Amino acid sequence: MNRNPRMSKFQPNPRSRSRFQDETDLRSLRSFKTDFSNYLASDTNFLNVAEIMTSYAYGESNNAHEKEIQCDLLTENGGIEIDPTRLSYRERIRWHLQQFCYKTSSHGIPMLGQAPNSLYRAAWVFLLLICAIQFINQAVAVIQKYQKMDKITDIQLKFDTAPFPAITLCNLNPYKDSVIRSHDSISKILGVFKSVMKKAGDSSSEALEEEEETEYDMNGITIQAKRKKRGAGEKGTFEPANSACECDEEDGSNECEERSTEKPSGDNDMCICAFDRQTNDAWPCHRKEQWTNTTCQTCDEHYLCSKKAKKGTKRSELKKEPCICESKGLFCIKHEHAAMVLNLWEYFGDSEDFSEISTEEREALGFGNMTDEVAIVTKAKENIIFAMSALSEEQRILMSQAKHNLIHKCSFNGKPCDIDQDFELVADPTFGNCFVFNHDREIFKSSVRAGPQYGLRVMLFVNASDYLPTSEAVGIRLTIHDKDDFPFPDTFGYSAPTGYISSFGMRMKKMSRLPAPYGDCVEDGATSNYIYKGYAYSTEGCYRTCFQELIIDRCGCSDPRFPSIGGVQPCQVFNKNHRECLEKHTHQIGEIHGSFKCRCQQPCNQTIYTTSYSEAIWPSQALNISLGQCEKEAEECNEEYKENAAMLEVFYEALNFEVLSESEAYGIVKMMADFGGHLGLWSGVSVMTCCEFVCLAFELIYMAIAHHINQQRIRRRENAANEY
């Protein structure tokens, strides 16, 4: 309703003042405008006043123009209002739009309704269009920026107690050699492995350094040159080797006669010989206890060493090389103390009969015509994993090293560990029995202070004398991971050697990623088909799950290196079709990742441990105490532990950790703020103005519906009247 404030005080137009019939009428009209109640109670001629108001035009009247329906209401305060319900439908719509133009809080629209002429109105229409176009451009840019779903990474350094991670410890030798050979499949595999290694060694010996003179003619001149051929490995001629021997101590020479093809029955008939792979000669030989690991000043190209340097040797040529010397010190051979010693009875012949292996079984093992020792060992390790998968988990656990045989001493935060309670067994296909420290997810462990003394310190005994011939190194495999994660020692582990104290300094990082639509991370929990049941989701586990599903689908068997799905049997070690199918798809795994057939995202919440490594020789000669379960003299125990034991330290370098969290760079709040800012800048529109437009739309819709219903009622009445 439009109410003209100027009508509150009724002032007739001076030019029409004289047009009143008499002063009585004028006084009556003023009295009517002054006191409506008194006027109704008076004897004023109401019809005369109404006639005067409708007969004369006044400048202040809004209803002076002619209309089809003209009904003005007189209010108590003297105003005159139009009742829109008495207007026609089109006039009512027009009236509402006009009123909206006058009342809206938008800056440009009222100027259209109040424009005095068409030119003025056209200018404002042009300005409104320019502003509307500019606003649309800015609004599109704001929406596009929001749809990018950009994110920012916040890095915080928190000085708080960090939870101690889970530590998984494994022996680099998965199974005990003395136990595993009783298994027929393993015996066959080791037999084929030794024969293949022997052939590879023979071919390498033939390809060792040799010089030959060649003559060739260049421009008519005969030139003699020496050409040096180098084999695959540049190793010395002599190396220590275990052999069965017959020793005659009566002659006082302490030398023994080797029986290289026989397996010794014990330490009484075992000796160490200087073995030459080129000539297969083993000489000299002495009892095992007469050889001592030490350091030599010089070693030649054949690995023959001397404790004392020869006269005239320059200081720059002096080197402290690890070597093994017989008791008199007259004969020394270069030898890494932690390296395995060759067994001649295995090198020259097999202690078991492997004639039962068929040609198909040999082909299934995949050695083929391999001559590279490293590749042969890798293939042999894979074959052992396949063969062991045919056994039950309980059988595999019994064939690997027990908890107390591996873990001798342990302390955490400077206090002794409970080895039985603090370490949990986890069977791994590659490393056999592994033991997890801090496995209980309900117990919170943390370091009191930073440094090695307040972390995990553990002494481990690997028993190198019971290693498989496929175990290339002696030591421990260590993995640092979160309690909820599977350790994956074959992928994320670190190797620590025996005879050293290995220190692993840690720093923790916590990652918090945004899920969809800002990212594609996997939220808490594992996926439904995740093969590592009971563990949190990880990218490595996802890829292994995808690969296992692919192998089962295409080969009909599962890869024994990973957990199976749905009880599918693992691929058999001597099944040629299984092995060829598995090898084929293993080489295609890179293409699978590249073509996104295996789509594995990062977890939304992840704990990462970065590690720094250092080592020192252990135990020291001053450590003259009986270590672990050694009952010998202190010096002998030290030597034994140098070859068979390792000391590990895992600790926090500082009691703080980083928190990396992702957050939305441009959220809905910022988008609405920018949107409203541009809307106010270019159109002068606020949220309240938008509400005004919404109310106008509802009013127009309501009037349209009411008009439609009213028209239907009129038609029904007309039809009913026509029927009568």
Swiss-Prot record:
Effect of S105F: In e1515; loss of mechanosensory transduction between touch cells. Abnormal repetitive turning behavior during male mating
Amino acid composition bias (Polar residues), ranges on this chain: 1-15
Topology Extracellular: residue spans: 144-684
Localization terms from the record: Cell membrane
Start and end residues of each stretch annotated as Disordered: 1-22, 229-265
UniProt xrefs under PROSITE patterns: ASC
GO cellular component: cell body membrane; plasma membrane
Organism superkingdom: Eukaryota
GO biological process: detection of mechanical stimulus involved in sensory perception of touch; mechanosensory behavior; positive regulation of detection of mechanical stimulus involved in sensory perception of touch; positive regulation of mechanosensory behavior; potassium ion transport; response to mechanical stimulus; sodium ion transmembrane transport
Gene3D superfamilies found in the cross-reference section: Acid-sensing ion channels like domains (2.60.470.10), YojJ-like (1.10.287.770)
Keywords associated with the record: Cell membrane, Glycoprotein, Ion channel, Ion transport, Membrane, Potassium, Potassium transport, Sensory transduction, Sodium, Sodium channel, Sodium transport, Transmembrane, Transmembrane helix, Transport
Biased composition (Acidic residues): 246-255
Outcome recorded upon mutating A673V: Causes degeneration of the PLM mechanosensory neuron and increases channel current
Family: Belongs to the amiloride-sensitive sodium channel (TC 1.A.6) family.
PANTHER family: AMILORIDE-SENSITIVE SODIUM CHANNEL-RELATED (PTHR11690), DEGENERIN MEC-10 (PTHR11690:SF267)
NCBIfam families cross-referenced by the UniProt entry: deg-1 (TIGR00867)
Listed name of the protein: Degenerin mec-10
Gene name for this UniProt entry: mec-10
